[in-house]
A protein has these predicted regions:
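N-acyltransferase acceptor-side catalytic subdomain
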Residues: 1-248
Length: 248
């Protein structure tokens, strides 16, 4: 665990996060995520998953699945190196150096080819590890996502000054609209059980309006306190009306 935490580099690739998913029944055949891990003799570890569907990946590969089906081949099960239900870049191979990581990945490729799996995928790989996959002939798929990065802004106005006039005007208008709704915000670092219950209600509603069940269980959120989570609630007329989860 200590080695894993030291080399993972972010909360979502950490042992604590992945283990919490496993221990709180977020990963099973019903969800389509079956947890596995390659522990190489050189000290490198690769957490990966046997996937029975493509749900919770945030990468849409249904066209590939249909193509496999048209040619009489099974696309599932497949193997995926990713963080379940979490589309963030991170280290997919946990090891001390690129040579060790490449050796471990080669072992996983061999395992895939010798088993019944259709393919091996690595999703949202951080930039520092992409060459390892390229050197082993992985096919790279490019897409776009959006991230906000704090470029040493001194204040919010300093951030706004970096935008063009149209975007700056629109953002100020949106913030003024929120102010006029008389919504207040509450930040909580010492999260209590009731806070998690309120948060999970909002989390569940987000899925329910789309006719889906939540990917994550309520017990999962209550088990990740060592990852330094922060909850922010929006209040209106003394009632919590929305919530957001952050990690430090």
């Amino acid at each position: 665990k200590t080695f894993f935490e030291h080399h993972s580099g972010d909360p979502f690739s950490s042992y604590s996060f992945l283990n919490a998913l496993q221990e709180t029944n977020c990963l099973d055949s019903d969800s389509g995520w079956i947890a596995k891990c390659l522990n190489h003799t050189n000290g490198t570890a690769i957490p990966f998953f046997e996937k029975l569907n493509s749900q919770g990946e945030f990468v849409f590969d249904y066209a590939w699945a249909n193509t496999f089906h048209q040619y009489g081949q099974a696309y599932y099960p497949k193997l995926v190196m990713s963080v379940p239900f979490t589309p963030v870049d991170g280290k997919r191979i946990i090891g001390p150096d690129d040579e060790s990581r490449s050796e471990a990945l080669t072992s996983l490729i061999n395992h895939t080819e010798q088993s019944e799996y259709s393919s091996l995928h690595a999703l949202f790989v951080e930039e520092s590890q992409k060459d390892i996959f390229r050197d082993l002939n992985f096919i790279e798929r490019l897409d776009c996502n959006y991230k906000w990065q704090n470029k040493s802004y001194r204040s919010f106005d300093d951030f706004l000054d970096q935008l063009n006039s149209r975007h700056r005007k629109n953002m100020k208008k949106e913030r003024d609209y929120i102010k006029n709704l008389n919504i207040e915000f509450e930040q909580i670092e010492d999260i209590k059980e009731q806070d998690w219950k309120d948060f999970y209600l909002f989390y569940s509603i987000t899925y329910a309006v789309r006719g889906q069940r939540p990917y994550l269980t309520s017990s999962f959120f209550q088990s990740i306190t060592e990852l330094n989570p922060i909850l922010i609630f929006a209040h209106k007329n003394g009632q919590r009306i929305a919530a957001a989860l952050f990690f430090q």
